Amino acid sequence: VSAEMGEYERSSTTVADAYVHPIFKRYVQRLVAALEDMGITRDLLLVLSDGRTVTHDTAVQFPIRLVQSGPAAGAQAAVLYGGLSGVGDLLCFDMGGTTAKACLIEEGEPQRSASFEVARVFRFAEGSGLPLQIPAIDMIEIGAGGGSIARIGKLGLIQVGPDSASSDPGPVCYGTVSYTH
């Protein structure tokens, strides 16, 4: 799974990959079957955490390499649209439900890393998460996303997160509930 030095990091990467492998494999098999039922028989391409695309057969071999695929795909889209606009230096921003991620793109290339952490116990404390040795687009993460709940804290200041509206009732933009207190 990882050919890099670092026994603990290699082990944690391998264990994480083994954990998600059967779930991911079943999901991809169901997805490919559903696409075939709709008459779509081309190879399904998936995005790796480093922004490259691979066939579903390749992705299933080491699914941990897709753990940050959504934000990586966003960064690659920013590179594409920046290039079409003649802009090579960009700041790509990806807002999810609980976190927002930013990526610096210089001269049409996102910054990359050979490893990163997931599931940090302390959101910004390096070393408090599970290290993964997989190539990835380097992202800066903040703990506030589109579903984060904002409130007035004890000092009268606005506090955002860590609570999230999740999908039910969902963010205010869903229009299902009002979050005014």
What does each of the following model-derived ranges do?
Residues 66, 88-94, 139-141:
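Short glycine-aspartate micro-motif
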